[in-house]
Amino acid sequence: MAAGRLRILCLLLLSLHPSLGWVLDLQEASVADKLSFGKMAETRGTWTPHQGNNHVRLPRALAGSCRLWSLTLPVAELGLGYASEEKVIFRYCAGSCPQEARTQHSLVLARLRGRGRAHGRPCCQPTSYADVTFLDDQHHWQQLPQLSAAACGCGG
């Protein structure tokens, strides 16, 4: 009974502060914008959208523009050696980036690419990060600095 109360208290505390790793709305806004249907099912830490007829269609993260995506993962699945039954929200950046220049750096790099002197393309990457905090199996708070992307942009 005490363990149940402790879990409820922890969930309440985590839901009050979004930087602690739990957000009540587990669905990222960009995911909702990308999908025209609403029912989502969690499968081993990845979100798989479903239509009414149970036909599975995967989101095309790389087909859209660069944006922030979310996965709800068990802490153990992060692969960082922590023992915890908690789940955290891991945010990452994915999507395509236009070739057009937005900064002086991008302008020069595009020109060098055109001459064959630089390689690659602009890529979607985090522009800022957020810490993730969770309760481990020993009932100690663990904070993982800069684990999750907080914002995305095109670079390179």
Swiss-Prot record:
Keywords: Disulfide bond, Growth factor, Secreted, Signal
GO cellular component: extracellular space
Disulfide bridges in this chain: 66-124, 93-152, 97-154
Gene: Pspn
Chief location category: secreted
Observed phenotype of the null mutant: Mice show normal development and behavior, but are hypersensitive to focal cerebral ischemia or stroke.
Top-rank lineage group of the source organism: Eukaryota
Localization annotation: Secreted
Assembly description: Homodimer; disulfide-linked. Interacts with GFRA4 coreceptor and RET: forms a 2:2:2 ternary complex composed of PSPN ligand, GFRA4 and RET receptor.
Entry keyword Signal: yes
Its biological purpose: Growth factor that exhibits neurotrophic activity on mesencephalic dopaminergic and motor neurons. Acts by binding to its coreceptor, GFRA4, leading to autophosphorylation and activation of the RET receptor.
Signal peptide: 1-21
Native species: Mus musculus
UniProt-listed GO biological process terms: branching involved in ureteric bud morphogenesis; glial cell-derived neurotrophic factor receptor signaling pathway
InterPro entries: Cystine-knot_cytokine, GDNF_fam, TGF-b_C
Family membership: Belongs to the TGF-beta family. GDNF subfamily.
Identification of the protein by name: Persephin
GO molecular function, one term: growth factor activity
